[in-house]
């Protein structure tokens, strides 16, 4: 069945009954509402440009507010930014349904429609949408919004679809039921236009008349009349354009006709008014705006058609379009973008259409984005060029990484390479553009990736980067990948690159080089094969051709030597074949090269020999003996026995030999020389060239002497010369004769000289005088030589003389210094102090102080050597604490086991009594009941004594311990719940979980939860600091509520009680500041006093009231009273900081720190306003306004504050509130502007108050809680919680576990897996209690003793060893640097110590040892440090070097920076010496206290264990039969049962491998042991002992606790555990 196009007429109802008419009416209402939904859906689709659900589903899709918020963004983007819309993709909504944060979307939409000015008459409530309380009102608001936006030209017009759409009968019925279910009435959708018109603050009658005139003019169809009617000022129409008058007429006429037609389709004709057929003022304005927009779009299209940026800009700035963000300088961008959009639309539609307004707006936004990006890119490129010119690599990389530059990824590690390459490119090309930078950076980044792959030895990454097109490398071959990799690695190693990178040129050069090498190797192999083939062919010419191939790489291959090459290579190949035994053996390249070299050497030798022989022949022909002798000694000819003295003989002999060979007709030029290897070398005497083959057709010269012939002639001549030397035997006689002749000649010459002297005596005297002068000069020179020989002695004498002079001068200066010693001391002290200050400043502030500065202050460490011992003691105490904790954990586990055993014994005793009382009623047929009665704690709930329930209980205890001590889980859970359930959950579960902070531990943990939750809420929900003030944050609300009750209430009473009481007791106090109120009060008093009516008007404005001096006087008095009272309140508040609850102050501190961290750009004033809002407005202000509600003052029963009292408190609260928020009076409170100075002054006081309030210690210090607190505490924490709260908490954790613990390795998941599925309330309380008929089982309370499943501290031995190693190294280094000079650590450790240094070091160590001897015994536990200090300096140096290698292996120090990290550690120790000592002392005290507490806990556990042991023994002894009844010292008798008897009792189930017929032959003897609870079971078969079994009563109870029904004896007999316990109880134990 489908709904007809039009509703039924009134005639249809004449034939229907009352019920049918009522049903028809409901169907009609449902159809009308569905039509409105369809209209709203289509209008929203037009606005949002996306498809929406069907009308029947639209209501549900609106509840999360996403569509509404998107709609708000369409017309008010500044109010509803897209990024603020929660769950914009609706993924969260589709997964888990509605969330409380979806209400934010609804509020955004309401803010948007309020922002544009839609009358509040149409506004729905948030709950109308979120809870679906009144969806028709929401649709009504959407319709009103559509008409309002249409009037403003911001949205299309909504269309009336009544009677035009069809719905199924099921849809109509469902909608009618839905409307009837909520009892909702449809709003009058048709009256929206009239309501909007009535909302105008103008003369409604004039507007109505003008609108009617317009409608009538439109009906007449006269354009001029219509335009005149539209221009009537009473019509309040805007943006009228005369050129469009005809279009207005046509559009309005069409709209009026459609509206009239739609009105005729409606059934409720009696309720229709004139505006159902006439256009309203809003509709007329909307159509005008629509026409204006269309006309403006045509202008835009015309500008695009003309390609005119100026015309387009003017068209875009048309107010009718109301485009956002149009900028004059982007006209070209607009033209380009809108042209592109226009062409794309034409292609899609197949024809040219005008762009819609939204499309133009989108194009403007896109063009703005592109323009901004382009401008930002150009600015970024300018900055990059400037940075490149500055040559600061870090700045260049920073600018390159700027996103606005639109460049590929940049890697800062290669900053120097970017700087260098880009600087070179900039020098070559000038200012770099974006495209050039893009290509360059892309290439350089690819080069960086290649370098990083090389550094990491990553071959695959290297190859992928190398073949990347961005790298731009040419001729990269895949088969050479490994060669490229190896070659580049080798290049990096050769250059010794550390942090430097290979450049692109290096990469390309290496690639080309590798390619060339590869090609060269290929060609070389081919050339070698061709050479071998030529040798096989036996052709010297082919061999020469192959040798001359460039690829072979053979040098000095020449044509004349070709036969020799071929001969030698063939011989070498033949020899290789013989040696290897391979006939096909070939010569390798090196062997070929050796053959070529040998052939060239042979040719050179033969050539030089031939030249030498030719030279000899030529010299012989010239007849010059000396020339002949010289050429004979030519080494190239290698002639033997050539003697220089035989030159003439050689000449004669060789001339004779040549004459004998001379032939008259011999004119040939070729001669033959025989070589040593039997080959012949042919030499041309004219060209001096030789060859290895005889030239064809050329005769040889026979008259030319050969080398052999020349050698023969030389040998003969030399032999003859040797014979001639025999005459040397008579040489002595010749010498004697010559001596006598020489003596005669000398004597003759002497006589002649004497005669000459006598003749020339004056000349002789003169000569003697010259001789004496010479002698005197010689003596002088001798003295001079003597001085030179004794130079050291002379220098020493001179030094003594100079020393005397210098000493005299020194003594004079020393005397001067002694006279001015005070001034000198001051100067030196000032210099040393200044130097020490500079060094200390470097030590304190420098990140890496030099070693020389550290050495200057290293002596400070000597004064605190006990610090190192204390550190060792600290480590020892930590280890002892860990061991103690583990020991206590083991004791605790043992106590738990003993506790279970005691419980089993007690429960067994109770069960035994029940069994005995019913034992007589049992028969053979109901033995199973006996077994059931022996089951302990059957169905008694969570705390029943069974293993399964025990594990469930422990799992809950572990879970709630984790929730209590790890606040992040509850903090996240709070924000996963709907907002209306959060407060209930907090009060019902969380405050119970923390026992309402009744102890130090719970107060500390609850405060940690508040801190974590507040940080989580600010992180996820707060977009700006002011949101905390304007909103109502969940955590802030809960914190204030918690701390304002109980102790917080008493604090409020202490702070505000006295001043509030003063206000209440002052009956004449007047603080009214309203001028009108004061004015009326004055008139009333005047009339009451005079009895005459005042002539003044009663109703006046504030300004008129203030014109009367009496009113001003009263206002001044009220203001003085208000300021005086406010000062009292301010003083009470600001002087009571310490009385504000600590938790409240700490939360304020966390709020301040968290806001400052999330909003670093926020000013201190903004943050202080938020914190002040928390401390004053939320915590203190309610107590000021309503003290009776917070029991600040005592009120009589039924009493209340009087109105004047409440007004006075409200006035004070308002003033304090303005002061706390820093808000001044303005606007309607102009008369209070005199208080603004006071508010500003008071605000500064509030800021100081807030600052002091936030200065609180951390909770760990406040509550004396640390990581050992739970381990030291003897009593375990307990919580009391109802079963319903337990189940609800478990359910919530299961539902939201993935949100609050995303990591599946989180401990929460493990604990939830331990708990398993969600239990029911009867499962937790037990079926027996559930059957008792409690009205509300969920309110039954259970107690949980919280325990930590993950408790335990792992002592990190490696960490302790590392710290000890570092500590020892630092101490050794501190000792070394005080005695060794040097600027670096390596230099100091490599120097040898002198005797003086060793002595000074030994003296210091002796003093330290004496100091250590006085150290108390508890600090002497680690003696290794003391032992190290006694080592000599050389050994300490070796120890430090070894330790440095170990520390470097651990990654703590690095040799690259000279172990600066260790020097920094020493500097840090010196800086933190005093602070560290106090902190370590406090840590030692804390650990000692912890150790003492653990010892106390250990003693408690041991005592409790002893007590439990005694109690168990007592229980067992009590169960044993009384010794009096059995006789003292008498042993209890044994029981004897056959297997058949035990089978009949149900105790025995079966015996494996033994039929039941033989059971009568098996006897079981049960004998009590010496200790209570122990039994010995002896099995006999046919009277023969077979097996013995020790049975422990507690083991049986443990099996029963674990739910084991059957156990084995002797590994064969199966017995019923419950019935066996019953049998032992009955026969051996007391009843």
UniProtKB/Swiss-Prot annotation:
It holds the Pfam family IQ. The modification Phosphotyrosine is found at residue 162. One of its GO terms (biological process) is mitotic actomyosin contractile ring assembly actin filament organization. Signal peptide: none annotated. It comes from the Eukaryota. The keyword Cell membrane does not apply. The keyword Phosphoprotein applies. The modification Phosphoserine is found at residues 539, 1424. Transmembrane segments: none annotated. CDD domains: RasGAP_IQGAP3. One of its GO terms (cellular component) is cytosol. GO terms for molecular function: actin filament binding; calmodulin binding; GTPase activator activity; myosin VI light chain binding; small GTPase binding. InterPro entries: CH_dom, CH_dom_sf, IQ_motif_EF-hand-BS, RasGAP_C, RasGAP_CS, RasGAP_dom, Rho_GTPase_activation_prot. Keywords: Calmodulin-binding, Phosphoprotein, Repeat. Residues 730-759, 760-789, 790-819, 820-849 form the IQ domain. Residues 1004-1253 form the Ras-GAP domain. Residues 34-149 form the Calponin-homology (CH) domain. SUPFAM superfamilies: Calponin-homology domain, CH-domain, GTPase activation domain, GAP, RGC domain-like. This is Ras GTPase-activating-like protein IQGAP3. It comes from Homo sapiens.
């Amino acid at each position: 069945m489908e709904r007809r196009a039009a509703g039924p007429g009134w005639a249809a109802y004449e034939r229907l009954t009352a019920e049918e008419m009522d049903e028809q009416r409901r169907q009609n209402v449902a159809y009308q509402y569905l039509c409105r939904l369809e209209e709203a859906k289509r209008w929203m689709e037009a606005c949002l440009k996306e498809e929406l659900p069907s009308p029947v589903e639209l209501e549900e899709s609106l509840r999360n507010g996403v569509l509404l918020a998107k709609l708000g963004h369409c017309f008010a983007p500044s109010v509803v930014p897209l990024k603020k819309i929660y769950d914009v993709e609706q993924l969260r909504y589709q997964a888990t349904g509605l969330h409380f944060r979806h209400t934010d979307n609804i509020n955004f939409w309401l803010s948007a429609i309020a922002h544009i000015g839609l009358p509040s008459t149409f506004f729905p409530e948030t709950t109308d949408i979120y809870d679906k309380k009144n969806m028709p009102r929401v649709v009504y608001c959407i319709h009103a919004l559509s008409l309002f936006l249409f009037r403003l030209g911001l949205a299309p017009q909504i269309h009336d679809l009544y009677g035009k759409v069809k719905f199924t009968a099921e849809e109509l019925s469902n909608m009618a039921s839905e409307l009837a279910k909520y009892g909702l009435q449809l709003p009058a959708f048709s009256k929206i236009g009239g309501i909007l018109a009535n909302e105008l603050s103008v003369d409604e009658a004039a507007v109505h008349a003008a609108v009617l005139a317009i409608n009538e003019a439109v009906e007449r169809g006269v354009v001029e009349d219509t335009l005149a009617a539209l221009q009537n000022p009473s019509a309040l129409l805007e943006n009228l354009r005369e050129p469009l008058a005809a279009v207005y007429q046509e559009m309005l006429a069409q709209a009026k006709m459609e509206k009239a037609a739609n009105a005729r389709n409606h059934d409720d004709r009696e309720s229709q008014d004139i505006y159902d057929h006439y256009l309203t003022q809003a509709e007329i304005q909307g159509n005008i705006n629509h026409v204006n927009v269309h006309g403006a779009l045509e202008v835009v299209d015309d500008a695009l058609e003309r390609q005119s940026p100026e015309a387009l800009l003017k068209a875009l700035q048309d107010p009718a379009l109301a485009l956002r963000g149009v900028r004059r300088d982007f006209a070209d961008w607009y033209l380009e973008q809108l042209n592109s959009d226009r062409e794309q639309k034409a292609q899609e539609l197949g024809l040219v259409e005008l762009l819609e307004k939204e499309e133009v707006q989108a194009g403007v936004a896109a063009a703005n984005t592109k323009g901004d990006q382009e401008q930002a890119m150009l600015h970024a490129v300018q900055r990059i060029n400037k940075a490149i010119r500055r040559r600061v690599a870090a700045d260049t990389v920073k600018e390159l990484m700027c996103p606005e530059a639109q460049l590929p990824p940049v890697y800062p590690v290669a900053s120097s390479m970017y700087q260098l390459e880009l600087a070179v490119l900039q020098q070559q090309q000038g200012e770099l553009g974006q495209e050039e930078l893009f290509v360059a950076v892309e290439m350089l980044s690819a080069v960086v990736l290649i370098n990083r792959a090389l550094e990491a030895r990553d071959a695959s990454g290297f190859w992928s980067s190398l073949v990347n097109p961005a790298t731009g490398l040419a001729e990269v071959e895949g088969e050479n990948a490994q060669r490229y990799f190896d070659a580049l690695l080798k290049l990096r190693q050769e250059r010794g690159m550390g942090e430097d990178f290979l450049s692109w040129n290096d990469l390309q050069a290496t690639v080309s080089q590798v390619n060339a090498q590869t090609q060269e190797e290929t060609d070389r192999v081919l050339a070698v094969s061709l050479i071998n083939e030529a040798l096989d062919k036996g052709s010297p010419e082919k061999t020469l051709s192959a040798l001359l191939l460039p690829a072979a790489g053979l040098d000095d291959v020449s044509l004349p030597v070709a036969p020799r090459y071929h001969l030698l290579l063939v011989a070498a190949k033949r020899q290789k074949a013989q040696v290897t035994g391979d006939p096909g053996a070939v010569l390798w390249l090196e062997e070929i090269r050796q053959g070529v070299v040998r052939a060239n050497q042979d040719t050179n030798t033969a050539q030089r020999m031939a030249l030498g022989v030719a030279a000899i022949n030529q010299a012989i022909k010239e007849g010059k003996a000396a020339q002949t002798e010289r050429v004979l000694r030519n080494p190239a000819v290698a002639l033997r026995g050539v003697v220089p003295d035989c030159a003439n003989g050689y000449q004669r002999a060789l001339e004779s030999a040549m004459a004998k060979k001379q032939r008259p007709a011999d004119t040939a030029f070729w001669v033959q020389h025989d070589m040593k290897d039997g080959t012949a070398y042919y030499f041309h005497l004219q060209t001096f060239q030789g060859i290895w083959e005889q030239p064809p057709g050329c005769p040889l010269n026979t008259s030319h002497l050969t080398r052999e012939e020349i050698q023969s002639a030389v040998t003969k001549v030399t032999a003859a010369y040797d014979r001639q030397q025999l005459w040397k035997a008579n040489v002595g006689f010749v010498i004697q004769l010559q001596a006598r002749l020489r003596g005669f000649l000398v004597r003759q010459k002497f006589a002649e000289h004497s005669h000459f002297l006598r003749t020339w005596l004056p000349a002789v005297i003169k000569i003697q005088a010259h001789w004496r002068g010479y002698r005197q000069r010689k003596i002088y020179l001798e003295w001079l030589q003597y001085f030179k020989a004794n130079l050291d002695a002379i220098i020493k004498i001179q030094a003594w003389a100079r020393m005397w002079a210098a000493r005299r001068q020194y003594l004079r200066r020393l005397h001067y210094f002694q006279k001015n010693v005070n001034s000198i001391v001051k100067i030196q002290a000032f210099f040393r102090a200044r130097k020490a200050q500079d060094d200390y400043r470097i030590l304190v502030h420098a990140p890496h102080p030099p070693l020389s500065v550290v050495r200057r202050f290293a002596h400070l460490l000597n004064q605190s050597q006990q610090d190192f011992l204390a550190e060792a003691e600290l480590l020892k105490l930590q280890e002892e604490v860990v061991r103690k904790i583990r020991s206590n954990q083991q004791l605790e586990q043992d106590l738990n086991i003993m506790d279970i055993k005691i419980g089993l014994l007690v429960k067994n005793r109770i069960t035994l009594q029940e069994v005995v009382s019913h034992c007589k009623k049992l028969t053979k047929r109901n033995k199973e009941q006996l077994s059931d009665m022996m089951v302990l704690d059957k169905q008694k709930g969570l705390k029943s004594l069974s293993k399964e329930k025990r594990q469930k209980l422990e799992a809950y205890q572990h879970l709630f311990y984790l929730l209590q001590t790890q606040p992040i889980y509850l903090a996240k859970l709070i924000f996963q719940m709907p907002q209306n359930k959060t407060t209930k959950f907090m009060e019902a579960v969380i405050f119970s979980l923390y026992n309402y902070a009744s102890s130090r531990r719970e107060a500390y943990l609850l405060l940690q939860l508040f801190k974590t939750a507040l940080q989580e809420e600010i992180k996820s929900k707060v977009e700006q600091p002011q949101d905390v003030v304007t909103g109502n944050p969940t955590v802030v609300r809960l914190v204030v509520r918690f701390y304002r009750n109980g102790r917080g209430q008493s604090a409020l009473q202490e702070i505000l009680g006295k001043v509030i009481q003063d206000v209440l007791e002052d009956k004449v106090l007047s603080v009214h500041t309203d001028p009108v109120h004061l004015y009326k009060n004055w008139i009333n008093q005047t009339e009451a006093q005079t009895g005459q009516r005042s002539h003044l008007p009663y109703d006046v404005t504030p300004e008129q009231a203030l014109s009367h001096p009496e009113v001003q006087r009263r206002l001044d008095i009220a203001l003085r009273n208000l300021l005086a009272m406010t000062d009292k309140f301010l003083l009470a508040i600001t002087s009571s900081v310490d009385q504000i609850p600590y938790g409240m102050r700490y939360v304020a501190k966390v709020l301040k720190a968290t806001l400052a961290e999330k909003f670093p750009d926020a000013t201190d004033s903004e943050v202080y306003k938020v914190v002040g809002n928390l401390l004053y407005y939320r915590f203190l202000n309610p107590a000021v306004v309503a003290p009776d509600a917070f029991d600040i003052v005592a009120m009589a029963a039924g009493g209340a504050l009087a109105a004047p009292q409440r007004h006075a408190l409200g006035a004070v609260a308002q003033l304090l509130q303005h002061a706390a928020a820093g808000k001044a009076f303005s606007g309607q409170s102009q008369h209070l502007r005199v208080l603004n100075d006071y508010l500003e002054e008071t605000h500064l006081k509030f800021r100081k108050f807030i600052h002091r309030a936030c200065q609180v210690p951390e909770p760990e210090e406040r509550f004396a809680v640390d990581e050992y607190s739970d381990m030291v505490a003897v009593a375990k924490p307990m919580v009391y919680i109802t079963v319903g709260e337990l189940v609800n908490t478990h359910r919530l954790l299961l539902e939201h576990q993935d949100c609050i613990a995303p990591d599946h390795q989180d401990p929460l998941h493990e604990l939830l897996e331990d708990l398993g599925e969600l239990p029911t309330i009867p499962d937790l309380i037990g079926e027996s209690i559930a059957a008792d008929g409690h009205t509300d089982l969920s309110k039954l309370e259970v107690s949980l003793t919280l325990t930590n499943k993950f408790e335990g501290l792992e002592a990190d031995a490696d960490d302790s060893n590392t710290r000890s190693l570092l500590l020892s190294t630092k101490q050794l280094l501190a000792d070394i640097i005080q005695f060794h000079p040097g600027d670096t650590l390596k230099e100091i450790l490599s120097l040898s110590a002198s005797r003086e240094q060793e002595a000074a070091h030994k003296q210091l160590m002796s003093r330290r040892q004496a100091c250590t001897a006085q150290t108390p015994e508890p600090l002497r536990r680690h003696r290794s440090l003391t032992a190290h200090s006694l080592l000599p300096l050389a050994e300490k140096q070796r120890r430090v070097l070894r330790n440095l290698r170990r520390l470097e292996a651990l990654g703590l120090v690095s040799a690259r920076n000279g172990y600066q990290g260790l020097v920094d550690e020493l500097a840090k120790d010196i800086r933190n010496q005093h602070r560290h000592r106090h902190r370590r002392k406090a840590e030692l005290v804390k650990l000692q206290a912890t150790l003492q507490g653990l010892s106390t806990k250990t003693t408690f556990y041991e005592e409790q264990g002893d007590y439990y042991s005694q109690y168990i023994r007592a229980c067992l002894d009590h169960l044993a039969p009384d010794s009096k009844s059995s006789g003292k010292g008498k042993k209890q008798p044994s029981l004897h049962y056959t297997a058949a008897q035990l089978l009949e009792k149900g105790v025995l189930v079966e015996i494996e491998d033994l039929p039941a017929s033989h059971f009568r032959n098996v006897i079981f003897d049960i004998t009590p042991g010496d200790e209570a609870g122990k039994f010995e079971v002896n099995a006999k078969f046919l009277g023969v002992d077979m097996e013995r079994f020790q049975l422990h009563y507690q083991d049986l109870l443990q099996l029963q606790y674990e739910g084991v029904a059957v156990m084995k004896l002797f590994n064969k007999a199966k017995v019923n555990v419950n019935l066996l316990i019953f049998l032992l109880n009955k026969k051996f134990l007391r009843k």
